[in-house]
Amino acid sequence: MRALFLAASAAVLTASACSAAAQSVDGAAIYNRCAACHTATGKGVPGAYPPLSLDFRQMAAKPDGRRYLVAVVTRGVAGPLTVEGKPYRGFMPAQSGLNDASVAAVLNHVGASIATTGPAFRLFTELEVAKHRASSADLNGAAVAKLHAYLSGAK
């Protein structure tokens, strides 16, 4: 019984530490890179860079959508996208230099402070990002764009 308690306590502490690590990274500072294209407010640039608003929140509300959002940051996007009924050329380079805590932090910044329209936002954890990064390792930018089309119903 004591061993079970210790194992459960260790799991809770590990999950808490990973969540705290993602929250201690400054997602707003990382987002400054994103703002060069998506703008500081996340409104994007018509035809070129999509807004980070309702589409982001809708994706973040679905398990496969959360994987997609991690893949966008870690694998990039290459190909046409339709976001909120408007076409975009769909190119974003992979931000492969970001560790899992940084990816979680920037996604959490967008979901909590920029994309404020749509379903309730649940924070990403470092562990969740690591899981989605691993499951998306074989995707290239074109596959990520197709994943967006599939998840948004534009198949």
Write out the residue ranges for each language-model feature.
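The canonical Cys-X-X-Cys-His
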Residues: 27, 31-40, 92, 106-109
